[in-house]
Regions:
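Transmembrane alpha-helices and adjacent helix-loop boundaries
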Residues: 1-358
Length: 358
């Protein structure tokens, strides 16, 4: 039974690697404050750059969440885009209520609605929004996972079911009568906790909150990898039948990490929305969930750090390609997946580890 690569890297990582990680964290903590510098200052960064990096950090959290279920438990989910979007919609409901004040959100007025739907009750309160962000995706993952794992669904069938769930969610949210803005979704946010969303200081706070979530997700992942729980998850991935013969019930372990992964995605989605200023059903597109799997594969499954690198590499390249050669972006993404499958089965982290051993 193979030991989790994340645990191996953590135990054997030289001091210089840990120091490099600390330098990166400090640099990311300093980075948002460069947006406060005058535009003529060579160190100044634009609000666009700050938002772009904040988006990538949100995606990095999604990559960690997916790595927990795919890299450790061996469950390839193609539905994490749904949990990400649900967290974003929960935050969007709060932001829309803040923008509307005592009235109805703009899209409801446009559709001639006379009152808020029942499920919007309390959405003007930030504390309730936080509850929705955690509980709605968490409960959905818990219910779906309970029936899927009880039925012993795994492999490609599990992947297909998660993608079908995401696609169904996207179709549901596209409908105007569901009360979530239809095709346009939520936009036009003005304030958050009384602060202007577009203010640079608010952007900095959101960036730092995303960074804290990323660090906490990594810390939680590494902590799990070092415990008996992490070793059992790896056994679920490598030899589930043998684990069952040893007296363990894999369903509980898979259900816990599946639900935890969904909640992490939702928190990332909640921080994503106020930074980009919009949430719509396209975030639930099956291609987004497939793209997240590419981040993990490129960085290296079961490493936690690798998926963070993969998310950064792919989304950084995507930003450049969509500006320089937008018509070729999908070809580039497909090429990455093919090359990683053929030449980097253990991802970038596996390549670095192999080079260090030589």
């Amino acid at each position: 039974m193979n030991q989790p690569l994340a645990m191996t890297l953590t135990q054997k990582a030289p001091i210089i690697s840990r120091s490099l990680g600390a330098v990166v964290v400090v640099a990311l903590m300093i980075l948002p404050f460069l947006a406060l510098l005058p535009a003529e200052n060579p160190l100044a960064i634009s609000t666009y750059t700050l938002t772009l990096i904040g988006k990538i950090l949100c995606y990095a959290v999604v990559a960690i969440a997916l790595d927990l279920v795919w890299g450790y438990a061996g469950l390839l989910s193609l539905g994490h885009g749904l949990f990400f979007a649900l967290g974003g919609y929960a935050m969007g409901m709060y932001l829309m209520r803040q923008a509307a004040g005592d009235g109805l959100p703009a899209f409801m007025s446009f559709l001639s609605w006379s009152e808020l739907p029942w499920f919007w009750s309390g959405s003007q309160h930030f504390a309730w929004a936080l509850c929705l962000i955690v509980l709605v995706p968490g409960l959905l993952a818990l219910i779906f996972g309970y029936f899927a794992f009880r039925s012993k669904i795994k492999g490609v069938y599990f992947s297909i079911m998660t993608q079908a769930l995401t696609y169904a969610g996207m179709l549901l949210f596209f409908r105007n009568e569901t009360g979530f803005g239809g095709n346009n979704g939520f936009t036009g946010f003005t304030t958050m906790l009384g602060f202007p969303v577009s203010a640079t200081s608010t952007r900095i706070a959101l960036f730092l909150a995303t960074l804290v979530l990323l660090i906490a997700s990594l810390a939680l992942g590494f902590a799990l990898a070092r415990t008996k729980f992490g070793r059992v998850l790896t056994a679920v991935r490598d030899a589930e039948n043998r684990l069952t013969f040893c007296g363990y019930d894999p369903k509980g372990f898979k259900l816990f990490v599946w639900t935890l992964s969904a909640v992490l995605c939702a928190l990332a989605g909640a921080l994503y929305v106020p930074q980009v200023g919009i949430i719509n059903p396209s975030e639930m597109s099956p291609t987004n969930s497939i793209e997240a799997a590419i981040w993990v594969a490129l960085g290296g499954r079961g490493t936690l750090i690798g998926p963070v690198l993969g998310a950064g590499i792919v989304n950084g390249a995507k930003s450049w390609f969509t500006m320089a050669m937008p018509e070729y972006w999908q070809f580039f993404l497909g090429l990455i997946f093919i090359l990683v499958t053929l030449f980097l089965p253990k991802g970038v982290i596996g390549l670095l580890k192999r080079g260090r051993e030589k």
